Amino acid sequence: LHARLNWDGNVPSVIAGSHMDTVPGAGHLDGALGVVCALEALRVLKESGVALQRPLEAVSFSDEEGRFGGLFGSQSVAGLVTPEYLHAACDLDGISLTEAMAQQGLDAREALHAQRNPDSIHAYVELHIEQGPVLDRKGLSIGVVDAITGLFKWEIRLSGAANHAGTTPMDMRADAFQGLAEFAGQIDRVLAEYGSPHSTATIGRVELKPGAANVIPGEAVFSLDVRDTDSQTLEILADAFRRTLSAIARRRDLMFEFSVLSDIAPVQCDTSVVSAVDAAVNTLQLPATHLNSGAAHDAQIIAGIAPTGMIFVPSKEGRSHSAAEWTAWDDIEAGANTLIYTLRQLAA
């Protein structure tokens, strides 16, 4: 969804936006804050009568959080969606992206023609909650983002042999859960040996089959989410986790396979946009710091076609993807004003 101000299609736009979707059980600010503040920024600048040399746009991207893999809207705009992706994209219930869109009267194939001409975008700015504890703990209102993390997300399947829990000796088992447990216990070691201070790895979803209390799990299916702000570090970590899985599978008489759900490169924010955010912060005399984003955002996709930057506001106690997600109204006001001043400078 787009809103446009002073747009005639001839001059590259300055765009602000984010996404409206979020994860199950989440709060009300993730993504939505950036969309609402983008609309408010356009309203304020229009009503103030400020003379701008460039048009402004507000955008709301779809499926950033990833029912079908994540960042679908921004990847469509960036020209990264392929027919193969549309064919393969499914949610955890096996419902395909194509099917879900058809149920709403939409044609997923239209995403193949949604690419924005890079020459039509002067800059993109995204206001977002930090989703981490740094700003809140430091008592700061604004985070100026220097880099956005990259990530790879796998679905891993360890296959052994389901068997009776009481009659199968411990040394004669091919227990898929024991393989998963050993792998989980190796995460800290892998990060310490091959990662950086910015590296994270998370197992966020686990399914054991057949799932009975008196049956040895014959299959363990789980997710692995690994992040860092450096592409080479991510490649090294991917290799280290593959080797760790292979060694555990051999030792425990298991088979393993994995599929790549997401593979997103880290990006550095554009220095001209970062400078515009810095100037806005200085003008408003707001307490701020520079930091990296540990979460993926639409901004890192749009960075492939346009100069991009991000503005963070604090998350109370660092909580996000939770009903406890909260940002103080004073900080929201500071973020909205920083966005307004940033857009004004970029469009001047």
Q: What is the predicted role of each segment?
A:
Residues G17-S18, P287-T338:
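Zn-dependent metallopeptidase/amidohydrolase metal-coordination segment
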Residues A51-L52, A111-Q115, T167, R189-I203, ...:
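Flexible, glycine/charged-enriched surface loops at secondary-structure junctions
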